[in-house]
Structure formats: structure tokens, C-alpha cells
């Protein structure tokens, strides 16, 4: 794990940068570039936008749709046009302010505009802080799947202002906790009880230290393997089914909730292939997360999306599995095992959270 100077994490590699974690960072952010394009989602609290605009005096501010609605080629093209309309120069910077979807989009804009300009990110959700803002993966979705178009474009710096987390309802905060918990399963098991602790909450005494350690896991991985030639693939634990659930439900299942469900499926597969039984850990997280019930699904519904996932190839569907805690590995899992364990997973999901009828699936606003 890379050294942490209190709440500063250094990310190494060809273009090293730092991740700062603390409160009140939005108002204190500074970049060396004289011109800045600020990109933020429509549902971001206006106080956050006001603070960053006062700190950076952007040449252009672009508001985009919220969550994954911004990660489309039409939105991407529209943002590029907005930058071109103000003649933003090559020595300018793009700043992404918001959740992980917006920072993914903003990074891809920065990587593409004038063949690449400086990029900075100010994640305002736990998911954005733990996962999307660190590592340099940027991009947008296609109807055929998530993140199929993009680029590796590391930021110059990341600022995680923990005060922004106080605005998040539990379901949104818990989405980011899923990625942090994943880091505990694949690399740092000390994170597991800390994430489930009452102290891990917005403003809680365990928040910043636990957040820093979760980010440090990913920082260490991407320092050693930026472009996912080896170890970085382990960060996809739980994501093969997660991406399939998102696609099969037309993205009505939020990413972090899909990851929670996907980690339990991966734990079942790990056990089926001879690994330790870690399903107690993944079920404990689901109980803490309290994800919304899934709509009725079958293996045949999600299989086409798993088969076209980036983690699939001509020899089968590749999954990240666990021999034990902090012992991840890659395996191609036969379809018959995937089907059998999906049926087992679905039964446990039903026992955990009964599937509602199609006309009573709760919205994000009605989930406790």
C-alpha cells in the first residue's frame, strides 16, 4: 500500500498525482491552468458549484444530465462543442465536479479535446471518491454495454471534500461503500468491519481514515498496473454480473447496488470452484447496504450481457474470484456453473429481499 501522509495519497506511474481527502476542499481548490472548463451534473447542490466557480473562475461551465444519463455519446459531443465554442485553448484544464459518472465523462472530454488537455476531478459522492476519480479510466456507455468507449487519462489531482457526503441519502452513500468493501475483499480485509461499523457514515469518526485506506488500495493497484494488463483486473470483482444487471434492467439498478449483488454472486462462484466460503461477508454487506429489490430476472436474461462484457473472451466468461480474503485470481467459469450458481444466488436474493411485482418496484426516492 502506498504511504499516506494523513489524508494525502500519492498515486504513482507515468503521470503521478495526489489524492487529497478532507473537509472544505471545494472552496480551496486551485489549478495552475489559467482557463478552466467546469463540468457538473444538473442535480448537484448549487452550493458546491458556487464554491468551485468562486475558486476557479471557469471560462465555461457545462451542466450535464445526472448519473449515467450523462455518459452517452450525444452528451459527450455536446460538451466538446461547448468547449470549442468558447475557443478553450490547449493549455486549459477540464474539471469534473460531481459523482463518478460525471468524472468519467469529464475525463473522456479532457482526453479527447484538442487531443488531450489537463484534467482534475472533484468527486462529491463516495462512489466517485473510492472508485471513479482514481485510476485514469474515463469514458461513456453504449446501448450495448457500459464503458465501451473511453480512454486512460489520469487526472493531475483529485480533491475529495468529505463535507459533500453529508448531502447523500443512505442508498447513494452505500453505493460507494460497495466499492470500498470490494477493496477489503480483494486486498485489505481490515476494511470490512470498519465499513459495516456505525462510525462509517458522513461526518462519522471513522469516515476519513477508512476512506483513505480504501482509496489507497486502488492507488496502489493502478500505480503498478495503469492499463489493466494484470493486477488491475482484480478491481473488477463483482462487476461482471453487476454490469449485466445494469444493462438487463435498462440501468434502473444503480451501479453500487449492482456491485453489492455482484460481489455475492462472485463469492458463490469462488466457493463453487474450491475457494473459501466468503458468502457471509457478502451477505453481511447486503444487509448493511439495503439495496432495492431486483425486478424478476433469469439467467437467460443476464447471460447475453455477461457474455459480451469486457471480461469475456473467446474461451469463456472471465471472472475475478477469491481463493480467500485478499487472494484474488482470474478464472474462466463454465456456463453450467454460472447458471447453477445464478439460481442459488437468485434464491438467496429472494430470501434477502423479496422481488416486488413489476408495478411496485420502488424508485430511488422511496427506498429507505
Swiss-Prot record:
GO molecular function annotations of the record: 3-dehydroquinate synthase activity; metal ion binding; nucleotide binding
Annotated metabolic or biological route of this protein: Metabolic intermediate biosynthesis; chorismate biosynthesis; chorismate from D-erythrose 4-phosphate and phosphoenolpyruvate: step 2/7
Cofactor: Co(2+); Zn(2+); NAD(+)
Binding annotation for Zn(2+): 179, 239, 255
This protein's UniProt keywords: Amino-acid biosynthesis, Aromatic amino acid biosynthesis, Cobalt, Cytoplasm, Lyase, Metal-binding, NAD, Nucleotide-binding, Zinc
GO BP term (any one): amino acid biosynthetic process
E.C. no: 4.2.3.4
EC primary class: lyase
Binding site for NAD(+): 100-104, 124-125, 137, 146, 164-167
Reactions mediated catalytically: 7-phospho-2-dehydro-3-deoxy-D-arabino-heptonate = 3-dehydroquinate + phosphate
TM regions (residue ranges): none
Pfam families in UniProt: DHQ_synthase, DHQS_C
GO CC, alphabetical: cytoplasm
Chief localisation class: cytoplasm
Subcellular location: Cytoplasm
Cofactor descriptive note: Binds 1 divalent metal cation per subunit. Can use either Co(2+) or Zn(2+).
Primary role: Catalyzes the conversion of 3-deoxy-D-arabino-heptulosonate 7-phosphate (DAHP) to dehydroquinate (DHQ).
Family per record: Belongs to the sugar phosphate cyclases superfamily. Dehydroquinate synthase family.
Official protein name in the record: 3-dehydroquinate synthase
Amino acid at each position: 500500500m502506498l504511504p499516506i501522509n494523513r489524508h494525502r495519497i500519492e498515486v504513482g506511474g507515468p503521470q503521478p498525482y495526489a489524492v487529497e481527502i478532507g473537509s472544505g476542499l471545494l472552496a480551496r481548490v486551485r489549478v495552475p491552468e489559467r482557463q478552466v472548463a467546469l463540468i457538473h451534473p444538473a442535480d448537484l447542490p448549487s452550493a458546491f458549484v458556487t464554491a468551485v466557480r468562486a475558486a476557479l473562475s471557469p471560462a465555461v461551465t457545462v451542466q450535464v444530465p445526472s448519473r449515467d444519463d450523462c455518459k452517452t455519446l450525444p452528451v459527450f459531443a455536446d460538451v466538446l462543442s461547448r468547449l470549442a465554442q468558447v475557443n478553450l485553448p490547449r493549455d486549459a484544464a477540464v474539471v469534473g465536479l460531481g459523482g463518478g459518472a460525471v468524472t468519467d465523462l469529464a475525463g473522456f472530454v479532457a482526453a479527447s479535446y484538442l487531443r488531450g488537455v489537463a484534467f482534475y476531478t472533484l468527486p462529491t459522492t463516495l462512489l466517485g471518491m473510492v472508485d471513479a476519480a482514481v485510476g485514469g479510466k474515463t469514458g461513456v456507455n453504449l446501448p450495448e454495454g457500459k464503458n465501451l468507449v473511453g480512454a486512460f487519462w489520469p487526472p493531475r489531482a483529485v480533491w475529495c471534500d468529505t463535507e459533500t457526503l453529508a448531502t447523500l441519502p443512505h442508498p447513494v452513500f452505500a453505493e460507494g461503500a460497495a466499492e470500498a468493501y470490494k477493496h477489503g475483499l480483494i486486498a485489505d480485509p481490515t476494511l470490512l468491519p470498519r465499513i459495516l461499523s456505525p462510525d462509517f457514515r458522513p461526518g462519522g469518526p471513522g469516515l476519513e481514515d477508512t476512506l483513505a485506506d480504501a482509496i489507497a488500495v486502488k492507488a496502489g493497484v493502478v500505480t503498478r498496473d495503469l492499463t489493466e494488463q494484470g493486477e488491475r483486473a482484480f478491481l473488477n470483482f463483482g462487476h461482471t454480473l453487476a454490469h449485466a444487471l445494469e444493462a438487463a434492467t435498462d440501468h434502473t439498478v444503480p451501479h453500487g447496488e449492482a456491485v453489492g449483488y455482484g460481489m455475492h454472486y462472485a463469492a458463490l462462484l469462488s466457493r463453487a470452484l474450491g475457494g473459501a466460503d466468503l458468502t457471509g461477508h457478502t451477505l453481511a454487506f447486503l444487509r448493511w447496504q439495503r439495496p432495492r429489490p431486483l425486478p424478476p430476472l433469469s439467467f437467460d436474461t443476464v447471460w447475453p450481457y455477461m457474455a459480451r462484457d469486457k471480461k469475456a473472451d473467446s474461451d469463456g466468461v472471465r471472472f475475478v474470484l477469491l481463493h480467500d480474503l485478499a487472494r484474488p485470481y482470474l478464472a474462466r467459469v463454465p456456463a453450467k456453473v454460472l447458471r447453477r450458481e445464478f439460481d442459488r444466488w437468485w434464491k438467496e436474493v429472494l430470501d434477502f429481499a423479496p422481488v416486488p411485482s413489476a408495478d411496485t418496484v420502488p424508485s430511488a426516492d422511496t427506498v429507505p
